[in-house]
Each structure stands twice: as C-alpha cells, then as structure tokens.
Swiss-Prot record:
One Pfam family recorded for the sequence: RPE65
Location(s), subcellular: Cytoplasm; Cell membrane; Microsome membrane
Disulfide bonds: none
Full protein name: Retinoid isomerohydrolase
Entry keyword Signal: no
Function: Critical isomerohydrolase in the retinoid cycle involved in regeneration of 11-cis-retinal, the chromophore of rod and cone opsins. Catalyzes the cleavage and isomerization of all-trans-retinyl fatty acid esters to 11-cis-retinol which is further oxidized by 11-cis retinol dehydrogenase to 11-cis-retinal for use as visual chromophore. Essential for the production of 11-cis retinal for both rod and cone photoreceptors. Also capable of catalyzing the isomerization of lutein to meso-zeaxanthin an eye-specific carotenoid.
Catalytic activity: an all-trans-retinyl ester + H2O = 11-cis-retinol + a fatty acid + H(+); lutein = (3R,3'S)-zeaxanthin; all-trans-retinyl hexadecanoate + H2O = 11-cis-retinol + hexadecanoate + H(+)
Residue numbers bearing the N-acetylserine modification: 2
Binding of Fe cation, residues: 180, 241, 313, 527
PTM annotation (Phosphothreonine): residues: 101, 105
C-alpha cells in the first residue's frame, strides 16, 4: 500500500465541524464524465452537529445524525442533507442543551429543576439514545437509519424527511442491534443483538426480518429470533458491531471488549455515566468464535478460540468445502479502540494525533479458517487442509480449536477499514476484491483496493483530501467481479480546492472517472448505500 503521508496542516479537523442542513438540493459541478448507467442515490449517515449551544459532544459517535444524499441522473449530480428528527435531536433543539446521553457524552439534568425533581428523575430508568448516525438500510420498501441501540428511524430516501421511530424491543427480544445487518437478495434482513437468556444470563439473538409479502404488512412486525448464541460471561456481553453470514452458516465473533451491565444500570441511572464508561476489557478470554447452522436454526458448539483483538467490521464470510473463511478488519489486543476516538484526540495537531495513535491497538486484515467437521482423533493436528491459505486451526486436548490467521494486509498504524465488496453478487460467497478506507493514525486519507487472494493493493490518494467509506456500484452489464465504480465523499480543505466532492473511481484500478464538487463542507460520514433508481 502507499507510503505514509503527513498532514501537518491539520485539514482533517474539518471532518468534525458542525454544518447546517439544506432546505433544497445543491447542483454539483462535475468534472470528468459520470457514466450514464449510474442512476440513483448515494445515501450516507454521520454526525453533523457537534455541540448544542455551549455544550459540546465529546466522542466521534456522539454528534447528531445528519442524512446525506447524492443524486445521479443523466450525468448530473445534486447534493442534499437533512438532520434526522430523532428524539435526541428534537429535544436538544427544543431545550437548547444535550438532553439524552450519547456514546461518550453525558446528558445532565435540566438546570431549571430543583434538586428533588432532578433526583427522582434518575429513577425513571435509562433513557437510551435514538441518534441514528451510523448507517441506513432497507427493510421491505422502507429505509431505516440506525445507531446500535433498540431504536431505528424510518426516513424518506427521496426527501430525507424523518417518518417515525421504531423500537425493535416491541417485536423481538434484543437490547439493541448492530448497524450492519445482512440483506439477502430477496430482501430478508438478518441482524444480531444481545438479550437476556435463560436464568437472566446474557446471550446473543439472531433476528430475521422477512421480505415484503403480498399482504404489504410491515416486515418488522413479522420479525423473529432464529437462533441464539451463548455468552462467555453471564452478565457482561461483548460489544458487537457486525457478524458474518453465508448461505448455510452464521458467524459471530465474541471479543474481549465487554459491556458491564451493572455499571450500565446503576452508575448511569444514579451518577450520570455514558456508554463509554460502561465498557471494560477482559484481559484473559482472548476471542471466541461461534457458528450456527442458518437453515436448521441451530447453534453448533465448536469451541473456536484465538488471541485477543477488537473487531468492528467483517469483510466477507464464505464456505469452502468443509471450512468457513472469515475475513476481518482486526485491531490487535484487548484494549477498546474507541478509547482513542474522542474528538479532542481527533482534532489535535498532527504530531499529537500520531502520538495518540501509537498507543492504540494496531490494525491488521486477517483471514481465519474455521473447520466445520471436528474429529477428536485429530487432537494436536492442524485441521486446515485447504491448499491456498496459511491460516491454521489446531485441535487441543480440551476440545477447543485454536485459530491462527493468515494476514492479508498489515501496516503500522495504517488501517484498511470500513470494508466493502461487490456484496449483491459475492456477499457470503468466494470473492477476490475488497475496497476499504485507509486510516493513517485514524485519519482517513486514502482509498484502497485489496486482492484477498494475491494481497495485491491499489490506492487512490491526494494531498489534503479526506475520503469516506468506499461504496462499490456494479456495472449493469458486469462480466467480472470488479466491473463497476467506487463512490466516496471527500472533504478537501486545501488551498485552491472546493470544500468537498463526490469522487467516482474505476473499481478496476481506482483511477478517477469523475468528481462532483460542492461549495460547502461535508463532515465525516460513517456508512451508507447506493439506492438504484
């Protein structure tokens, strides 16, 4: 991958500045030629409000949700954005203060209330945020913006108007759900969230939302739990951001980053903690990998174990003969990476940003190979017999299977993150190419393509340019896996540049096809999708 680039001007700080929403779409200035087959909308979520009055938000995942849209039609591009009218946002705007506790920011009681009313207000229970700043996904004919709690927010993908809040707890037994559901080609949605299982111990439920049926009823009302994974700790679930899915299997990676529920329920209610205060690391458990039979809806009790890492994003998971291939964006060690994503750290001058990143867990793209058929007679042997990987799986005398990965990409403080693939055709299947956002000491400064078979890489990078997660859009007449384009929102605060633009790259070699520039800044976005017309 590319050599390390320096950012002494600190232009990345523009990613974390408050912006205003738009009353109507802006016409973007296009250079290059946008493919005429590219028609539809790029929808993205991220924070757009980093303070309320004089009260700042402290963490990257705290700012109020802003929904962005780039529309493509006949070679022209428009840009629009609206704040999502969540309860967190509406109440903050009404009361001119932070009302609901966010990921790393505490909401304090109304200063107008006396001490007694403030005290009793703490006992109304934990007020969970609905700040849907992480992702957007389809359910039936509808679209929902989400964070990682039990609340998702229905939005209009054309006007960007907020329609309604939905509480998943009204339909299934989960305390929350990830912002990375899997969407099958027929519209079936799978997700995972922790729950209270037998004897009040914690477990993880897989939620299935069916596709839209002939009766046109809301598919969410037909949600069901299809399988349950056990938890390594009865009262401390692991933080889960994504999971793996193939036609026949579900893969859940349980990391040592734990949520202390006692702290969540007591400290939060009584002393005003936030989500970040409730995380802790189990320094001895390592990582447990779990699998379930998707079609039979049955947990498979194979005890896969490996050394500790943080995990946020699965790249892809697929079946290869009697093995599961699990490709992950890992961060080495048990310390929580989110400890390094406070806005004060991310807004530091470049030398301080680098100093902070050197203390953090280091990134690595890894492939784990999970054998499905375990024969006790093979104790002490490597069960991986595939010829095309160096990953191993050793059956131990205690019946655990110790996994060592094949490293697909590693660079000191150079992460390949926010991965995307040709998901519609290759999700859950053997594949060759992954696209990622390159993080340089946590600063997004390049786009990458990785051949997971040969480990060859391609890079797009320009000075003072800070891209977002790459979104792959397949050519309608594609013959090969990487026939298409890659879309990314780039913030470009350098002298002589427009503040931001939508970048279109050839997915084959990451060469520029076109860009659509706008005259306003666009803050950081996390995840999104391309909605075809």
């Amino acid at each position: 991958m590319s050599s390390q680039v320096e950012h002494p001007a600190g232009g990345y700080k523009k990613l974390f500045e408050t912006v205003e929403e738009l009353s109507s779409p802006l016409t973007a200035h296009v250079t290059g030629r946008i493919p005429l087959w590219l028609t539809g909308s790029l929808l993205r979520c991220g924070p757009g409000l980093f303070e309320v009055g004089s009260e700042p938000f402290y963490h990257l995942f705290d700012g109020q949700a802003l929904l962005h849209k780039f529309d493509f039609k006949e070679g022209h591009v428009t840009y629009h954005r609206r704040f999502i009218r969540t309860d967190a946002y509406v109440r903050a705007m009404t009361e001119k203060r932070i009302v609901i506790t966010e990921f790393g920011t505490c909401a304090f009681p109304d200063p107008c209330k006396n001490i007694f009313s403030r005290f009793f207000s703490y006992f109304r229970g934990v007020e969970v945020t609905d700040n849907a700043l992480v992702n957007i996904y389809p359910v039936g004919e509808d679209y929902y913006a989400c964070t990682e709690t039990n609340f998702i927010t229905k939005v209009n993908p054309e006007t960007l108007e907020t329609i309604k809040q939905v509480d998943l707890c009204n339909y299934v037994s989960v305390n929350g759900a990830t912002a990375h559901p899997h969407i099958e080609n027929d519209g079936t949605v799978y997700n995972i969230g922790n729950c209270f299982g037998k004897n009040f111990s914690i477990a993880y439920n897989i939620v299935k939302i069916p596709p839209l049926q002939a009766d046109k009823e809301d598919p969410i009302s037909k949600s069901e739990i299809v399988v349950q994974f056990p938890c390594s700790d009865r009262f401390k679930p692991s933080y889960v951001h994504s999971f793996g899915l193939t036609p026949n299997y579900i893969v859940f990676v349980e990391t040592p980053v734990k949520i202390n529920l006692f702290k969540f329920l007591s400290s939060w209610s009584l002393w005003g903690a936030n989500y970040m205060d409730c995380f802790e690391s189990n320094e001895t458990m390592g990582v447990w990998l779990h699998i379930a039979d998707k079609k039979r809806k049955k947990y498979i009790n194979n005890k896969y174990r490996t050394s500790p890492f943080n995990l946020f994003h699965h790249i892809n998971t697929y079946e290869d003969h009697e093995f599961l291939i699990v490709d992950l964006c890992c961060w080495k060690g048990f310390e929580f990476v989110y400890n390094y994503l406070y806005l004060a750290n991310l807004r530091e001058n470049w030398e301080e940003v680098k100093k902070n990143a050197r203390k953090a867990p280091q990134p690595e793209v890894r492939r784990y190979v999970l054998p499905l058929n375990i024969d006790k007679a093979d104790t002490g042997k490597n069960l991986v017999t595939l010829p095309n990987t160096t990953a191993t799986a050793i059956l131990c005398s205690d019946e655990t299977i110790w996994l060592e990965p094949e490293v697909l990409f590693s660079g000191p403080r150079q992460a390949f993150e926010f991965p995307q693939i040709n998901y519609q055709k290759y999700g859950g299947k053997p594949y060759t190419y992954a696209y990622g956002l390159g993080l340089n000491h946590f600063v997004p400064d390049r786009l990458c393509k990785l051949n997971v078979k040969t480990k060859e890489t391609w890079v797009w990078q320009e000075p003072d340019s800070y891209p977002s997660e790459p979104i792959f859009v397949s050519h309608p007449d594609a013959l090969e896996e990487d026939d298409g384009v890659v879309l990314s929102v780039v913030v470009s605060p350098g002298a002589g540049q427009k503040p931001a633009y939508l970048l279109i790259l050839n997915a084959k070699d990451l060469s520029e096809v076109a860009r659509a520039e706008v005259e306003i800044n666009i803050p950081v976005t996390f995840h999104g999708l391309f909605k075809k017309s």
